[in-house]
């Protein structure tokens, strides 16, 4: 599995949400993480909800090629996403 992202967007995400895209990659270490469809755009996007330390985070991602995950944004999980995470465990 390989990650790609825009470095400037990662820095902006850190300033806005308190997490950059390098830190966000640890979401994939959560064995209970879930994936939900994101709102349709011009490319298929997904929401990955998982835990980092004691907080739930949501990453918006798209898949490129076979093993590449492109991080688009990361933020704290919303209440409905938290409920989905808990029910999926």
Where are these regions (language model features)?
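Ribonuclease/tRNase effector modules and their secretory precursors
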Residues: 1-89
């Amino acid at each position: 599995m390989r990650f790609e992202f825009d470095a400037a967007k990662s820095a902006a995400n850190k300033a806005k949400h308190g997490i950059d895209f390098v830190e966000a990659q640890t979401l994939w270490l959560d064995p209970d993480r879930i994936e939900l469809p994101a709102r349709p755009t011009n490319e298929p996007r997904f929401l990955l909800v998982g835990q980092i330390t004691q907080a739930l985070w949501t990453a918006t991602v798209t898949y490129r090629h076979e093993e590449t995950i492109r991080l688009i944004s990361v933020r704290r999980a919303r209440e409905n996403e938290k409920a989905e995470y808990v029910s999926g465990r």
